[in-house]
Every structure is written in structure tokens, then in C-alpha cells.
């Protein structure tokens, strides 16, 4: 009986003894899972932090790149020659032409000379050519030999040779026109009236309500024209065309030089039209 009890008690104690070694194994697995989870969380947090800092640094690098490009463009703009005005500046100044000139502005200062440049076809061509290459068309105000010498000094060798060849051809052409026959005396041609003189000749000296232009001693239009009946005065081009935005009852001064950045180009067209012709 004692032996059976010992066997039964031993048999009942064996499962309990067999279960005890499994508890440390479960604890070690739980700790391993916890450690792996914490490590993964730390790695993800590190990756997120790194991405955030890289995003901030990328924004700063973009700003530095834009600033560097702006500085380079500004440096190039400062190195460009300032003889020719950019077309963009002329277009930005164009809206000033659309604003009517008030009487206060007319009385504050004299109107600058917009009659220095005509509005004929040759004036348009000259203005456009000087804009594209102002150094190729110098100011020639001396005598004919002085102007030729100045041209030779200002032009390069190739262009001067071309110009010299053209002068030779022109000289031969002029020499070939000379005739050995005696020239018959020709009658003096009748005096041709200028446009201003012809217009004045059709209007009596005293004619109320009619506009009678004023001419100088050479028959050209005076820069300042006035209508006595209305009291308005305005500036005109050499061909008598009215300069835009100069008609008022204020004081005028049409003899001062015109600044190219002022109201108009001096050619009877707006700066916007000149920009369109250039493009």
C-alpha cells in the first residue's frame, strides 16, 4: 500500500515538475519581442527625424540656389553696356503716354523738346538703327574732312575698306557725269514754297476763328504754335505735325533737349509701337 501511494504521489508530481521549465522560456520570448518592437520604433523615429531635417535643408539649399542665380544675373546686368536702353524699360514707360497732362504739370516746368527728332521715314529708320548699334552711327558735327577722319578712326578695318571702296565707285560715277560741252545758262528755278508758307498763303492775315501757322525765316514751322481764338498752344514736329499731349493753355518751352526716357520717342509714335517694330 505504501508503495502504491508513493507511485501515485510521484505520478501526480511529475506534470507539475515538467511545467516549471517552460515559464522562463515564455518570459525570454516576450522580452525579445518587446526589444525588437522598441528597436523598430527607434529606427522608424530616426528615419522620420532624418527625413524632416533633410527636407528643411533642401528648402534652404533651394533658397541659396535662387539667391546665387539672382546675384549672377545682377552681376551680368551691371557688366552690360548702358548705351542702348532695354526694350523692357521702354515698354514699362509706355503707360505714361496714356495719362492726360494736367494744367498743374504744364505750369510746373517747361515742356521738353520733342521736336528734336522728326517723324519722317528716314527719322524712323535712323532711330531704329541707332538703337541696335549706337556706336556705329557717331555724331558728325564737324567739317567734311573732319567727319571722314572721325569715321576712319571709329570704324574697324573691314568696314572702312568697304566704305572706301564705295567712295571710289561713287567718285568714278561723279567723274563720268562731267561733260566737256559748254553748259547752257539755266534760268533760276522759281522759288518753291514750303509747307508752312503754302499753308499761310491760303489764310488771310486777319481771319477770326481760323488757325494760321507761324513760320521762321527759312519757311519752317516754329516749334511752338498757338491758336489765338482758343488760346491753346502746342509743340509741333519739323513737318508741322502736333506733338501728342502738349496742347494746353499753359506755358510752353519747346526748345530744350528731349530725354529719351520721357513722354515719347520724338518720332510721333509711342514706345510700345517702337517695341513692336523692333520685335
From Swiss-Prot:
Nonamer composed of three alpha/beta/gamma heterotrimers. Interacts with CD44; this complex is essential for the MIF-induced signaling cascade that results in B cell survival. It comes from the Eukaryota. GO terms for biological process: antigen processing and presentation; antigen processing and presentation of exogenous peptide antigen via MHC class II; chaperone cofactor-dependent protein refolding; defense response; immunoglobulin mediated immune response; intracellular protein transport; macrophage migration inhibitory factor signaling pathway; negative regulation of apoptotic process. It is found in: Cell membrane; Endoplasmic reticulum membrane; Golgi apparatus, trans-Golgi network; Endosome. InterPro entries: CD74_antigen (IPR043530), MHC-II_Gamma/Thyroglobulin (IPR052001), MHC_II-assoc_invar/CLIP_MHC-bd (IPR015386), MHC_II-assoc_invar_chain (IPR022339), MHC_II-assoc_invariant_trimer (IPR011988), MHCII_invariant_trimer_sf (IPR036613), Thyroglobulin_1 (IPR000716), Thyroglobulin_1_sf (IPR036857). Plays a critical role in MHC class II antigen processing by stabilizing peptide-free class II alpha/beta heterodimers in a complex soon after their synthesis and directing transport of the complex from the endoplasmic reticulum to compartments where peptide loading of class II takes place. Enhance also the stimulation of T-cell responses through interaction with CD44. The chain crosses the membrane at residues 30-55. Changing residue 265 to A: No addition of glycosaminoglycan; no effect on the synthesis of the protein. GO terms for cellular component: endoplasmic reticulum; endoplasmic reticulum membrane; external side of plasma membrane; extracellular region; extracellular space; Golgi apparatus; late endosome; lysosome. GO terms for molecular function: amyloid-beta binding; CD4 receptor binding; cytokine receptor activity; macrophage migration inhibitory factor binding; MHC class II protein binding; MHC class II protein binding, via antigen binding groove; nitric-oxide synthase binding; protein folding chaperone. Residues 56-279 are extracellular. It is a single-pass type II membrane protein. This is H-2 class II histocompatibility antigen gamma chain. PANTHER family: HLA CLASS II GAMMA CHAIN (PTHR14093), HLA CLASS II HISTOCOMPATIBILITY ANTIGEN GAMMA CHAIN (PTHR14093:SF17). Its main location: membrane. Induction: Expression is induced by IFNG and LPS, through CIITA. Keywords: Adaptive immunity, Cell membrane, Chaperone, Disulfide bond, Endoplasmic reticulum, Endosome, Glycoprotein, Golgi apparatus, Immunity, Lysosome, Membrane, Phosphoprotein, Proteoglycan, Secreted, Signal-anchor, Transmembrane, Transmembrane helix. Residues 1-29 are cytoplasmic. Residues 1-23 are annotated as: Disordered. Signal peptide: none annotated. The keyword Disulfide bond applies. Residues 193-254 form the Thyroglobulin type-1 domain. It comes from Mus musculus (Mouse). Disulfide bonds join 196-215, 226-233, 235-254.
Amino acid at each position: 500500500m505504501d508503495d502504491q501511494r508513493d507511485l501515485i504521489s510521484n505520478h501526480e508530481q511529475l506534470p507539475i515538475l515538467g511545467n516549471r521549465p517552460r515559464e522562463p522560456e515564455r518570459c525570454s520570448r516576450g522580452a525579445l519581442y518587446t526589444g525588437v518592437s522598441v528597436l523598430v520604433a527607434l529606427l522608424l523615429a530616426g528615419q522620420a527625424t532624418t527625413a524632416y531635417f533633410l527636407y528643411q535643408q533642401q528648402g534652404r539649399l533651394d533658397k541659396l540656389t535662387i539667391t546665387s542665380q539672382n546675384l549672377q544675373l545682377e552681376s551680368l546686368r551691371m557688366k552690360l553696356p548702358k548705351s542702348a536702353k532695354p526694350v523692357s524699360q521702354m515698354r514699362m514707360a509706355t503707360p505714361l503716354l496714356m495719362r492726360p497732362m494736367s494744367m498743374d504739370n504744364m505750369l510746373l516746368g517747361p515742356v521738353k523738346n520733342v521736336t528734336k527728332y522728326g517723324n519722317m521715314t528716314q527719322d524712323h529708320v535712323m532711330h531704329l538703327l541707332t538703337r541696335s548699334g549706337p556706336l556705329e552711327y557717331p555724331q558728325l558735327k564737324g567739317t567734311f574732312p573732319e567727319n571722314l577722319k572721325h569715321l576712319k578712326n571709329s570704324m574697324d578695318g573691314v568696314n572702312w575698306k568697304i566704305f572706301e571702296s564705295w567712295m571710289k565707285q561713287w567718285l568714278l560715277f561723279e567723274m563720268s557725269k562731267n561733260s566737256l560741252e559748254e553748259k547752257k545758262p539755266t534760268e533760276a528755278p522759281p522759288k518753291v514754297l514750303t509747307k508752312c508758307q503754302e499753308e499761310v498763303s491760303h489764310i488771310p492775315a486777319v481771319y477770326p476763328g481760323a488757325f494760321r501757322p507761324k513760320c521762321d525765316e527759312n519757311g519752317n514751322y516754329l516749334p511752338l504754335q498757338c491758336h489765338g481764338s482758343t488760346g491753346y498752344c502746342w509743340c509741333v514736329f519739323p513737318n508741322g505735325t502736333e506733338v501728342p499731349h502738349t496742347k494746353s493753355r499753359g506755358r510752353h518751352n519747346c526748345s530744350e533737349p528731349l530725354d529719351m526716357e520721357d513722354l515719347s520717342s520724338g518720332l510721333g509714335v509711342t514706345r510700345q509701337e517702337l517695341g513692336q517694330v523692333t520685335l
